Amino acid sequence: PAAASDTQNVSAGCTQRSYTTYGGLKAAPSDQRTAFICDNVVVTFQDAKRQHVVLEFGLRGGKKDSPMAGFDGTMDKDGMTAKIHQMYLARDALNPADDGTCHLTFAGRAVTAAQCSASMHQGKNRWAAAVDFKAIPDR
């Protein structure tokens, strides 16, 4: 498990550009699109080299079934971009991501913003999520 110092719990908000979609295997205008609302992200670096990262967006104090979006991936050498390998839109429902990236912004080692997008499919259905998250600076 990651050292406790490698987990950051960041309060903030998802911007209006955050949403999830659900539809057929090919993205289409008829896909069901839902605004994604969050006020918190938990960023966990799973290894000492800070290469394996998990970002989980959701509502602080949210119920088990409240909307969430999780992205699990590997940081690129630039230290700011992650290639997403797995994603989930419900707890314990990890799925391989067809494609996905997260771009992180840091102040020192603290995450101040994150933009993630990824999609996954199961059978003939496709889910996608795009999250644009900005931290609230400490006053």
Q: Language-model features: where?
A:
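Acidic, glycine-rich flexible loop segments
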Residues: 77-131
